[in-house]
Structure formats: C-alpha cells, structure tokens
Amino acid sequence: MSITKDQILEALAAMSVMEVVELIEAMEEKFGVSAAAAVVSGGSDAAAAEEKTEFDVVLTSHGDNKVAVIKALRAATGLGLKEAKGMAESAPVAVKEAISKEEAEALKADLEAAGAAVEIK
C-alpha cells in the first residue's frame, strides 16, 4: 500500500517545526540534495520585459501660473494651501508616488493644464 500526498501533508502538518527541520536534513542526506532556493539566471532582458506597474509623478516646475498649479496640487493631494504652495515652490518634488499608470497620467494632465512641468518616473 502506497502513501498518498494527502497523507504526507497531514503527517507534516502534525509535526513540530523541529521535526520538520530534522526531516528536511534527513532528506538532504538521503537524496544528496540541498533545500536551498534555486538561483534563476536571467539577464537584463527579463527585467526589461517586465512592465512597470507603479509610477511616481514629479513636479519639475510650477511654470508661469503658480496659483493654478497650487490649486491643482491641493485638489490632487488634499494638502492645505501652505503645504501645496511649499510643494510648488520646492520643485522638483514628488507629488504622488507608487500610483497606477492611469492615475499618474491623469494627474500629469491636470497639472500640465494648470501650467506645471511634470514628469512620470
């Protein structure tokens, strides 16, 4: 009679952490393997192929219409007048970080419509 996977899982669930560690060590010795994680050797192509999912919106300049930019900053971030003014005057500064591409593009459009220079990173 053979043991099923479910029976093995149930037996493991009933073990203490120390018993599981001892079991792993015994398996390493018996089969001549290591439980270390395998190293994936991917080039920079793999990183370039992944699409970026989080973006930062950076105000690079408030432009000629600082008042409109401050209003747009307040609407986008919920900051008070003093904080939004300080943000506009301390450009370049991150307006929002780790947001979706759609949200970043919408924020950039709003700020550019107010006269600001904006980058998405």
Curated annotation (Swiss-Prot):
InterPro entries: Ribosomal_bL12, Ribosomal_bL12_C, Ribosomal_bL12_C/ClpS-like, Ribosomal_bL12_oligo, Ribosomal_bL12_oligo_N_sf. It comes from the Bacteria. Gene3D superfamilies: 3.30.1390.10, Single helix bin (1.20.5.710). Disulfide bonds: none annotated. GO terms for biological process: translation. GO terms for molecular function: mRNA binding; structural constituent of ribosome. Keywords: Ribonucleoprotein, Ribosomal protein. One of its GO terms (cellular component) is cytosolic large ribosomal subunit. Belongs to the bacterial ribosomal protein bL12 family. Forms part of the ribosomal stalk which helps the ribosome interact with GTP-bound translation factors. Is thus essential for accurate translation. Homodimer. Part of the ribosomal stalk of the 50S ribosomal subunit. Forms a multimeric L10(L12)X complex, where L10 forms an elongated spine to which 2 to 4 L12 dimers bind in a sequential fashion. Binds GTP-bound translation factors. NCBIfam families: L12. This is Large ribosomal subunit protein bL12. It comes from Shewanella pealeana (strain ATCC 700345 / ANG-SQ1).
